[in-house]
UniProtKB/Swiss-Prot annotation:
CDD domains assigned to the protein according to its UniProt record, in alphabetical order: URO-D (cd00717)
Function text: Catalyzes the decarboxylation of four acetate groups of uroporphyrinogen-III to yield coproporphyrinogen-III.
EC number: 4.1.1.37
Protein name: Uroporphyrinogen decarboxylase
Organism of this sequence: Coxiella burnetii (strain CbuK_Q154)
Protein family: Belongs to the uroporphyrinogen decarboxylase family.
InterPro entries: UROD/MetE-like_sf, Uroporphyrinogen_deCO2ase_HemE, Uroporphyrinogen_deCOase
Superkingdom: Bacteria
GO cellular component: cytosol
Amino acid sequence: MLRLKNDRFIRALLRQPVDRTPVWIMRQAGRYLPEYRQLREKVPNFMAFCKTPELACEATLQPLRRFPLDAAIIFSDILTIPDAMGVDLHIAPTVGPVIRNPVRSAQDVNRLQMPAVEEALSYLFDAIRLAVKALDHRVPLIGFAGSPWTLACYMTEGQSSKTFLTARAMLYQQPDVFHTLLQKLTTLTIAYLNAQIKAGADVVMLFDTWGGLLTPSLYRQFSLDYLSQIAAEVVRQKNGRKIPLIFFTKNGGQWLESIANSGCDAVGLDWTTDIGQARRRVGDRVALQGNLDPAILLSNPESISTAAVDILKSYGQGSGHVFNLGHGIDPSTPIENVAALVEAVQNFSIKNEEPINSYYR
């Protein structure tokens, strides 16, 4: 098994020594890149684009040609699993995801398909294999999925929402039905992530984008318990190498200790949590990822550099930190501001030199 030329990201996730803080950016492959917008012109339909392995691979690689990032993330969408289950998914250009047959009853849940993941989502695994080959062991490749709760939000609401009131109401009105839906999603998510690892993903991440909408009690019952189940059943070693698992719950700072105890290797933070305080709260249980406010990337390089350094100082010395945004990059972000961010993180965080590929031996 060939080792990665740059395993800084994985070492930080496992809280092993690194020469500097690794950096990557959520949604680093996307609309802020002019070359991505040009690529999308070939296949305007978003899901059709995701289902074309060669295009998904190219989108994955594009940000690494511009910026010296420490990881690639496969280009895809969290709604691939609901799509494979038979919901009528449409991505509207100005609206976002729309599900024309929302899941709102026991009958709706029972009608959902439970496909063989490696067949139904083979396009994603083909894209991973292409990306692994193209990366040629330069940096790790991240695979990902949406959390069961977040996927269920879209499936029950029928579209994106700031509140997901329909989904939240169902938790009170039909809790057993909702648990059945979540268990189906959990079963498929485990198979999905394991198939991504089999195809070549070095790290996997779960995006619990809407977990922060829940009460503390409901968060544990309807989100965290299912995340813990995934952590227990996802492959964590392959060919003698550890496969780190990252959990990201937006607005989940109040439950940081519980998330840290859920079985993941690293916890993603949004920008509303102080990373220094977060480090003190979790101790040496998990690594932390984050957590620059994406809005600052719409300002200027000087402000961006200052804010990035503030986060690095707040975290302090030692490993266990992966620099990232607190959520996905905004499509209107200027390219030069992304470059300024990456440069600031790299220049400030350089530590005592040591071999960065010593983990994969």
